[in-house]
């Protein structure tokens, strides 16, 4: 259950991340850069799901749209991929199911496998119905949602990973670079070759942030650790991700990390008998004996307070970019063969992060940079990562 204190803490507003000047952001987790994911998502027919709660009282509507205070809240989620892929969309839908079960005044539904090019139609259909809030969970939905939000001021819109807002449209993301740093420490402690491979999606600030954070974490415990990066140029392409992982292993990497919406790279590492760290969702079942740990999401800690504010009539558009203290970005469970020494090191560092005693970027070229820069401008690697970020 989400208590009042936690709800307030988890609604961390980043006023420094205004929409102005953020137009260079190319894409974000689970989304696309241009039309990259359109083809893939379009190959699967969009499907819908619905679950129901119960109805309670009513009062008045907030300025930003949404239901009257105390009324049933009808919420819809739109996903870029199928929710069974154990990745980005899966993590969001796990949270949808959790809040649906928790609140008897909430009714939820979803549409999966929606290409960005088709998302405006889906958003409009929901807005024309009885939906009070629509969550668009991929970067490529940003402009379509922004357009639809203007035409439906009484509907609340929330967009994941983007930078545009309206009076009735908020945005949200988590500082996944914090658990990435911790997972990086684990990789730095288990590598014997001092060479760690990273299967990356797109060369965009969000992915570069994650690579850099993991490298900084690894080198904080092992200054000799280096990272090799292979770009897949897709969020979900299991065959290519597996090929990239195998290529990195052939180059001498004895630990494989990934930023993909499938466990393909984790599977490849497990098959090759090397350590591995996943992303988005717990992937221990695929890493087996060689599994380390993964940075994952618990979006319940965002969706819960957001829906509560809608139910209470207090919702306002904001820019959520919470860290591990919010419970949104986190680590999953350790693999079966991770040493206590590694666990203790990561636990101690996690405590420092949670107590605001450690800044991931301290001592790097990005120390002291603004949240705006970290969110949308980071475009180069830290020391220890081979090569350059493609332009």
From Swiss-Prot:
The UniProt keyword set, sorted, is: Plasmid, Signal
Where is the signal peptide, in residue numbers? 1-28
Q: Which GO terms describe its cellular component?
A: plasma membrane
Sorted alphabetically, which CDD domains does this protein's record hold? PBP1_BMP-like
Pfam annotation, one family: Bmp
UniProt feature, compositional bias: Low complexity: 42-59
Ranges for region Disordered: 24-71
Q: How does it assemble?
A: The complex is composed of two ATP-binding proteins (TsgD13), two transmembrane proteins (TsgB13 and TsgC13) and a solute-binding protein (TsgA13).
The free-text function statement in the UniProt record for this protein reads: Part of an ABC transporter complex involved in glucose import.
- State the family named in the UniProt similarity comment for this chain: Belongs to the BMP lipoprotein family.
Q: What is this protein called?
A: Putative ABC transporter glucose-binding protein TsgA13
| Species of provenance | Haloferax volcanii (strain ATCC 29605 / DSM 3757 / JCM 8879 / NBRC 14742 / NCIMB 2012 / VKM B-1768 / DS2) (Halobacterium volcanii)
């Amino acid at each position: 259950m989400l208590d009042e204190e936690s709800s307030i803490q988890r609604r961390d507003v980043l006023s420094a991340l205004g929409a102005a000047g953020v137009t260079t952001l190319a894409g974000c987790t689970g989304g696309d850069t241009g039309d990259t994911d359109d083809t893939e998502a379009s190959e699967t027919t969009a499907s819908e799901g619905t679950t129901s709660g119960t109805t309670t009282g009513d009062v008045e509507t907030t300025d930003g749209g949404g239901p009257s205070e105390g009324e049933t809240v009808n919420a819809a989620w739109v996903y870029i991929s199928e929710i069974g892929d154990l990745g980005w969309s899966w993590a969001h839908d796990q949270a949808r199911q959790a809040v649906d079960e928790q609140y008897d005044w909430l009714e939820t539904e979803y549409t999966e496998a929606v290409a960005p090019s088709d998302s405006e139609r889906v958003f409009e259909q929901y807005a024309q119905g009885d939906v009070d809030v629509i969550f668009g969970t991929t970067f490529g939905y940003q402009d379509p949602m922004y357009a639809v939000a203007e035409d439906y001021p009484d509907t609340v819109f929330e967009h994941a990973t983007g930078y545009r807002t309206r009076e009735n449209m908020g945005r949200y993301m988590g500082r996944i670079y914090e658990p990435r740093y911790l997972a990086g420490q684990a990789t730095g402690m288990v590598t014997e070759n001092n060479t760690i491979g990273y299967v990356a999606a797109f060369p965009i600030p969000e992915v570069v942030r994650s690579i850099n954070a993991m490298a900084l974490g690894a080198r904080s415990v092992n200054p000799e650790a280096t990272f090799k990066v292979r770009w897949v140029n897709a969020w979900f392409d299991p065959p290519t991700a597996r090929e990239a992982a195998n290529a990195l292993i052939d180059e001498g990497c004895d630990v494989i990390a990934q930023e993909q919406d499938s466990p393909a790279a984790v599977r490849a590492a497990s098959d090759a008998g090397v350590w591995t760290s996943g992303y988005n969702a717990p992937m221990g079942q695929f890493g087996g004996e060689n599994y380390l740990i993964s940075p994952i999401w618990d979006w319940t800690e965002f969706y819960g307070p957001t829906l509560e504010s809608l139910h209470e009539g207090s919702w306002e558009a904001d820019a959520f970019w919470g860290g591990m203290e919010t419970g949104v970005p986190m680590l999953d469970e350790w693999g079966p063969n991770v040493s206590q020494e590694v666990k203790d090191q990561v636990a101690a560092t996690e405590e420092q992060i949670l107590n605001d005693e450690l800044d991931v970027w301290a001592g790097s070229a990005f120390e002291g940079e603004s949240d705006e820069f970290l969110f949308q401008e980071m475009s180069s690697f830290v020391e220890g990562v081979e090569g350059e970020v493609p332009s």
